[in-house]
């Protein structure tokens, strides 16, 4: 099979990378007032340049900035939206792992103004990335519009600003459409919408939580699909857009479980993206049967390599699982990646940077073995 020249690529990765110790120390120093914002930026720039080289040396056709300038994959973007303010207190999201539970506690949000883009979000970050890649396509990740809604729901809206939820949905889609156009003008040709909500909704416990706050949990995924479609319908012709779905990724822990069955038919047949990055590293993700709904022309990037644990997968096992997936969607529509990012938040998952590099190299080598150069 021929080498793909348009994203997503046969060997790809979700986006975030483990933060180097020097960068973590600089963030702590900045928070404590020991260094300036310019000092922190200089460290970020140097470490991002190194991360880009690492990705290109591994053989990847795309490169991100590792999300090194962010505290988390989604909240930095959401806080930067016009109309969104940090509210007193913190959200508490329970994550699970083999040892028990931990909590992710970002600042709560309040929507107290009309949702809009004031300044292009991550513009400087993308411009730096684009200017430093040499062989790879610069890839930018942003949270899906659904993430603005999922955690808080209608309760986070000021009713004086949004007495009608439909106006909120319309403004949210328009803001994202504006951001997509702005990023396109900066030269972005590979944009990814990261979305845990569409994966979480496969879990009955998550749907019960949504129903408990008075929303239609059985149809919310349809609203979310339409929100993304509205945001990307006028995307630049040169821009490939993917979405990444997972069930939570914080310090090697997760939130939800369950296959893609509940959302699969609508998700794969209606969501107008170019490709789907799907978590598939263990039994929590279910089987490949939902892939039967993937139409011709859409790529599925199988997240078979775990980013939660350090153990390196067997190339033979990865090939076998790709062959299993190919029973439901043609092999030519498949690709390979990690199951999620390596560091969705600044804390990162429980593996080393050398182990991260080995996993990226494994993805590249295995994809080359399966699909050729």
What are these regions (language model features)?
Residues 1-373:
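Domain-level signal for soluble alpha/beta catalytic cores
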């Amino acid at each position: 099979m021929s080498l793909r020249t348009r994203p997503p690529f046969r060997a790809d990765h979700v986006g975030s990378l483990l933060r180097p110790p020097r960068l973590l120390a600089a963030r702590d120093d900045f928070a404590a007032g020991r260094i300036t914002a310019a000092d922190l930026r200089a460290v970020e720039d140097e470490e991002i340049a190194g991360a880009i080289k690492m990705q290109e040396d591994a053989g990847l056709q795309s490169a991100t900035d590792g999300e090194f300038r962010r505290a988390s994959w989604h909240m930095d973007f959401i806080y930067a939206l016009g109309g969104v303010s940090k509210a007193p207190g913190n959200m508490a999201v329970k994550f699970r792992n083999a040892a028990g539970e931990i909590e992710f506690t970002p600042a709560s949000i309040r929507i107290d103004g009309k949702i809009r883009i004031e300044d292009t979000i991550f513009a400087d970050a993308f411009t730096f990335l684009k200017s430093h890649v040499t062989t790879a396509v610069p890839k930018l990740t942003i949270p899906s519009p659904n993430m603005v809604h999922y955690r808080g729901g209608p309760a986070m809206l000021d009713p004086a600003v949004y007495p009608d939820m439909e106006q909120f949905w319309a403004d949210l889609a328009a803001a994202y459409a504006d951001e997509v156009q702005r990023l396109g003008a900066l030269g972005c040709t590979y944009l990814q919408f990261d979305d845990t909500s569409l994966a979480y909704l496969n879990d009955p416990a998550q749907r019960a939580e949504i129903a408990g706050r008075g929303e239609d949990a059985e149809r919310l995924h349809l609203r979310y699909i339409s929100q993304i479609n509205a945001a990307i319908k006028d995307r630049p012709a040169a821009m490939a857009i993917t979405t990444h779905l997972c069930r939570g990724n914080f310090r090697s822990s997760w939130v939800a479980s369950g296959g893609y069955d509940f959302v699969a038919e609508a998700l794969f047949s209606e969501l107008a993206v170019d490709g789907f990055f799907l978590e598939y590293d263990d039994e929590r993700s279910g089987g490949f049967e939902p892939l039967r709904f993937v139409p011709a022309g859409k790529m599925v990037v199988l997240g078979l390599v775990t980013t939660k644990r350090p153990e390196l997968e067997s190339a033979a096992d990865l090939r076998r699982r790709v062959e299993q997936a190919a029973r439901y969607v043609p092999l030519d529509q498949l690709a390979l990646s990690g199951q999620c990012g390596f560091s969705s938040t600044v804390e990162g998952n429980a593996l080393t940077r050398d182990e991260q590099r080995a996993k990226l190299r494994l993805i590249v080598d295995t994809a080359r073995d399966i699909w050729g150069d």
